[in-house]
């Protein structure tokens, strides 16, 4: 294949014009101690500290990189492309501790990734000439360095370690298909062929112990989890509870085995691997155990609540009973007789009131008789990592229901729905479809699971139906294909293709799409796989997962609302161009290398799907072939970038024409993934297809600490909308504040000096203000000094020890004075109400959540769904996205959202209602933690507190030690600040 240059020049380094800098990356404990530090590393100058940290801490190879290398001579491989090995002769000249180390330059990483792809592409015959291969190598290195695209994490971890450094190790049980014959062979090296795939779908048969069965799946899952990949399976083949077994007896049912798999995944998660087990469990809506599956996580969350509440009640009341048995004034057996001991009677009565088991009460009295004065009863919390969640089931997977059009039509028509047995297709139970739908909606409302996958839509867009149905997805639901296949992902950073004049660089975007399609295709050839079956089918169908990130950021920069016809039209056009180009390139590769092995039997169906994609790209509203739900076609009238629309139409013309002539090299080419970690390494403001979540963020500093910044797209958007530089500065200052009280209204340096503030105290205060979420959190004994607060401000030690102390109010400032100063110093953290900002421009800055304390606006549920629907007709797979819903959303709202997603042609959707998980950080604060148990009045709930608020409140606690009562009640609250866990423990006592 020919490879053109769009970013680089032949004969020049691809890094020419890309500035680099020396940086440091470190991880610190909350106490300031350093856990990890890598200094004097070479990184692109434009990269943020977060991007540098991800690269250095996650993607740099930490060991085994030789200090001296030599090339390996290979026949017909250009000298610049030859693989490298340790130069042992040169290494022996070095001290032993200097011979091997880790990667220390971003260029090393870019070179090993791009070099490995080029090397395997050359060996596989993908390039017409060495010049084309070199152009491919240079263009990819430039795009990586300038954050235009990034592959999924396994590529960064594994790709190129053998080619670039000669790193090798014993085989780990992987397999690879011979590129020429397709014969699957067992790998004899751990590193020669990398494992670049992040997403897997695995089958499971209704068999207990044989290969391909239930227990075998846990082993196959474990092999994937161990290496950081995710997997999904459809468990609908498993018999329901009480179905007959071949050897006699009754099946224990689907749920009993799902709980085993959940435990296995949880054990691996806690076994020291780099990340949680990523797992998707899918069950068809007609399975006899579907109702229990739907409510699984709801019930388990209720168990967590019971464990938390019950353990605390046991601890409190049983120790009260124990203490009452040892109160003074009574002797002998009288102490243990509630008729004689009024304190004991009162304690027993209180315990019975909260329904403590009678035998626990009796056992405690017996314990007291033996002289014991304290019961050690473990108490649990709703922390996600706590023993409470470890105790219950269902916490190690995403759960999804497969629903068919037939089921959804019966929901709307009020019809009946049969749950069918697995062994003989008999009817296990008949219920109203609406009742089951309501159960699904209630479960999603209460616990954010299950998600919904639209089975009919998925399979009507299936390119290879002759080879089998699509039954399942990967853990994030963007990859949907045949069982026992894998997909490797990469995502293009859309903001890097937005020109300064507001136009979209269509040519370079298409060029980049072409190159990264080739990268992913080469990755299929060079990869090794965790099982023989996956190796065989991945070779046979060669599915790819190219996508994009930063759509929300790009639309904001362009001054276009996420929830607008214009925003949706642009998303549709970009997606249409991307997938059209990938299939055109796939057809080009098929011409040179042949179509994928499974193409011929699926040819007619695949071309039908291609024609439907093309119709959608041309904006057609009818004449789709074999589709029950019409897709949302491209709305060219609302897309300002007309060249983008034309390019997408031409791409689909070419994709269909070339495909009809040569077939396709790949059964699928695109998905839209969540782009979490790779979004950070590309400095994306938004991930995948998501909108932004906040306008003001905390930026990490190289030396530690954070400061507030406005989303980088906000000033760009304001300029696009016609605001002048001084207006933009005013709006930004309104949002982020001035970070100082020097010239603030009401509470400023002059006002504080009158209260006794000295220059050194004011200096300490000023240092704390730039990173403060609220000025109240800078006014604390830790910042100002305990002695100053007591001796100068006249605040007693007792008050200084109070966690809820409002020091500003204590020294005489009013609420209105505080609000004026706080807005000046810390900003509104929103642009709503900003001076000079026109109301008609507010939608451009709408985010997934309300911004700051003053923000009221946020994107509605339907805006997320409609955006997904604008892109879905042009995606081979699906879109990974969770729809955020406010805490006030109802069960009916959840059901309506799922129904709208089906009607608009989506393949899958998941919901998250704010506050629907017990483990959601700080959700308890929403009702006010100061509500006493004996309060009779019902008070209005406070607004949800943010993590930064609570974390900074800790600073109000007294720094001197105060002796507390030996026995006191309280609660423990966990938060996460800057990636560090913070535990807030309160003690409540009489004063």
How should each PLM-predicted stretch be described?
Residues 1-991:
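Extended catalytic cores of very large enzyme megasubunits
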């Amino acid at each position: 294949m020919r490879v053109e240059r769009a970013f680089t020049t032949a004969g020049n380094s691809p890094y020419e014009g890309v500035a680099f800098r020396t940086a440091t990356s470190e991880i610190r404990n909350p106490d300031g101690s350093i856990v990890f530090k890598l200094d004097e590393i070479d990184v692109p100058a434009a990269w943020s500290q977060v991007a540098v940290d991800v690269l250095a801490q996650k993607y740099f190879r930490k060991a085994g990189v030789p200090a001296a290398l030599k090339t390996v001579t290979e026949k017909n491989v250009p000298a610049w492309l030859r693989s490298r090995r340790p130069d042992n002769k040169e290494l022996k000249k070095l001290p032993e501790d200097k011979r091997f180390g880790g990667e220390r330059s971003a260029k090393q990483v870019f070179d090993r990734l791009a070099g490995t792809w080029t090397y395997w592409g050359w060996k596989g015959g993908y390039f017409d000439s060495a010049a084309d291969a070199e152009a491919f190598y240079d263009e990819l290195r430039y795009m990586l360095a300038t954050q235009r695209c990034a592959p999924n994490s396994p590529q960064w971890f594994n790709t190129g370690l053998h080619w670039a450094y000669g790193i090798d190790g014993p085989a780990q049980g992987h397999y690879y298909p011979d590129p020429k014959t397709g014969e699957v062979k067992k790998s004899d090296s751990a590193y020669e062929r990398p494992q670049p795939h992040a997403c897997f779908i695995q089958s499971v048969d209704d068999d207990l112990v044989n290969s391909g069965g239930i227990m075998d799946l846990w082993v196959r899952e474990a092999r994937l989890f161990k290496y950081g990949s995710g997997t999904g399976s459809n468990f609908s083949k498993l018999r329901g509870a009480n179905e007959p077994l071949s050897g006699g007896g009754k099946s224990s049912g689907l749920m009993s085995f799902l709980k085993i798999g959940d435990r296995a995944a949880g054990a691996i998660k806690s076994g020291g691997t780099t990340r949680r087990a990523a797992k998707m469990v899918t069950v068809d809506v007609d399975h006899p155990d579907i109702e229990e599956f739907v409510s699984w996580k709801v019930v388990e969350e209720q168990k967590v609540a019971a464990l938390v509440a019950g353990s605390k009640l046991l601890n409190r009341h049983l120790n009260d009973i124990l203490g009452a048995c040892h109160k003074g004034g009574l002797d002998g057996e009288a102490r243990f007789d509630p008729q004689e001991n009024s304190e004991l009677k009162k304690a027993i009565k209180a315990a019975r009131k909260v329904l403590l088991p009678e035998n626990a009460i009796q056992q405690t009295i017996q314990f007291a008789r033996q002289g014991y004065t304290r019961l050690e009863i473990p108490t649990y919390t709703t922390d996600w990592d706590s023993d409470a969640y470890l105790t219950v089931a269902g916490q190690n997977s995403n759960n999804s229901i497969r629903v068919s059009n037939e089921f959804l039509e019966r929901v709307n028509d009020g019809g009946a729905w049969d749950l069918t047995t697995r062994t003989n297709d008999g009817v296990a139970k008949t219920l109203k479809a609406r009742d089951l739908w309501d159960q699904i909606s209630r479960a999603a409302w209460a616990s954010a699971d299950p998600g919904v996958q639209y089975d009919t839509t998925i399979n009507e867009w299936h390119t290879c139906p002759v080879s089998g149905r699509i039954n399942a997805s990967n853990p994030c639901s963007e990859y949907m294909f045949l069982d026992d296949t894998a997909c490797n992902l990469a995502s293009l950073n859309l903001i890097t293709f937005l020109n300064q004049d507001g136009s979209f660089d269509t040519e370079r975007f298409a060029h980049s799409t072409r190159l990264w399609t080739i990268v992913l295709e080469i990755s299929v050839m060079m990869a090794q796989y965790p099982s023989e079956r996956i190796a065989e089918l991945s070779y046979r169908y060669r599915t790819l997962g190219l996508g994009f990130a930063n759509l929300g950021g790009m639309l904001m920069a362009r001054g276009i609302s996420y929830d607008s016809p214009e925003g949706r039209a642009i998303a549709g056009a970009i997606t249409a161009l991307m997938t059209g180009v990938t299939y055109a390139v796939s057809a080009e590769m098929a011409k040179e290398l042949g179509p994928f092995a499974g193409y011929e039997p699926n040819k007619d169906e695949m071309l039908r799907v291609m024609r439907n994609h093309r119709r959608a790209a041309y904006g057609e509203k009818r004449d789709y072939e074999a589709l029950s739900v019409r897709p949302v076609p491209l709305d060219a009238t609302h897309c300002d970038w007309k060249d983008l629309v034309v390019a997408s139409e031409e791409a689909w013309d070419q994709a269909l024409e070339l495909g009809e002539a040569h077939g396709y090299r790949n059964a699928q080419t695109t998905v839209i993934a969540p782009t979490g970690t790779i979004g950070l390494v590309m400095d994306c403001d938004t991930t995948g297809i998501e909108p932004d979540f906040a306008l003001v963020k905390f930026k990490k500093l190289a030396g530690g600490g954070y400061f507030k910044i406005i989303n980088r797209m906000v000033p760009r958007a304001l300029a696009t909308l016609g605001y002048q530089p001084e207006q933009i500065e005013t709006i930004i200052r309104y949002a982020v504040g001035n970070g100082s009280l020097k010239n603030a209204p009401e509470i400023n340096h002059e006002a504080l000096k009158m209260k006794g503030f000295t220059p050194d105290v004011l200096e300490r205060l000023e240092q704390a203000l730039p990173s403060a979420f609220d000025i109240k959190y800078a006014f604390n004994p830790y910042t100002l000094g305990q002695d100053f607060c007591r001796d100068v401000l006249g605040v007693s030690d007792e008050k200084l020890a109070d966690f809820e102390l409002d020091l500003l109010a204590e020294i005489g400032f009013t609420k209105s004075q505080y609000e004026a100063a706080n807005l000046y110093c810390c900003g509104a953290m929103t642009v709503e109400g900003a001076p000079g900002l026109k109301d008609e421009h507010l939608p451009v800055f709408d985010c997934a959540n309300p911004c700051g304390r003053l923000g009221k606006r946020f994107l509605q549920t339907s805006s997320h769904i409609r955006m997904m629907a604008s892109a879905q007709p042009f995606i081979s797979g699906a879109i990974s996205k969770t729809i955020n819903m406010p805490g006030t959303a109802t069960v009916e709202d959840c059901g309506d959202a799922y129904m709208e997603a089906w009607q608009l042609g989506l393949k899958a959707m998941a919901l998250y209602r704010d506050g629907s998980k017990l483990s959601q950080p700080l959700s308890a604060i929403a009702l006010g933690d100061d509500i006493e148990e004996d309060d009779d009045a019902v008070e209005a709930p406070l607004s949800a507190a943010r993590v930064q608020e609570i974390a900074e409140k800790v600073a109000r606690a007294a720094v001197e030690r105060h002796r507390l009562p030996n026995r006191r009640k309280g609660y423990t609250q966990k938060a996460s600040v800057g990636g560090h866990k913070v535990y807030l423990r309160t003690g409540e006592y009489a004063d």
